[in-house]
């Protein structure tokens, strides 16, 4: 029997104990990842995932999430999902109930969620709405979004929204995506990723969290890896897959993450081009890397009473 392990990115500590409880009972890595991530998505103090996530430039919360299992490389994801608070569960349902597809986005993702009995909810909290309005006022005085009746007001809003996309993409964080990777007692692995994406992003933007090989990759021949940060870079670099390929070649998890991030950092990008990655191997070794000093990840084993923070290797 394999010793179960679960690791997560910054702010996953809210959910990891729920995931480890599943693993202690002999549950699957997939069940553990879903249980842990749902706790994170339901955490109203976290403005970068689930309910309370910061909205797009139009003031609408859009969520991305994915799950992938290591033994068969099954993958399910949703992108730009509106109105459903637990996208990780909808992503799992895509994988299990809609095997002819891997990824649903926008209206199609919401239709699938409704058809499969997921309960809808208002995702924009008062606090997140206030943060959005503050940014609009900072960018253009007295603009109230598309409720503004004047043509000139609408024009100013759209211009401000585009400026917000450009200004907020390189914001100072914390980087919002949550990564969780689990190894169960049967040797199966699962990677889960969930996010509300860049604050005030262009409507419809889908990042690396919903794309296999970019923000999420799991293959028992190497392990599991996930990314957070500048998603457009990991989309271009296939960063999560690169990490796992390096694990399969024998690199230690922290080194594999570092090498993959160094490769992605070499891509030209005018925004803040920092990525973070973490990885777990089928024999339970784990590590992470980041382009910012002081970055950590969280880990729990069967012997843990609470998540332990570990430093990431600096790129």
Residue ranges of predicted features:
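Alpha/propeptide regions of enzymes that mature by internal proteolysis
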Residues: 1-315
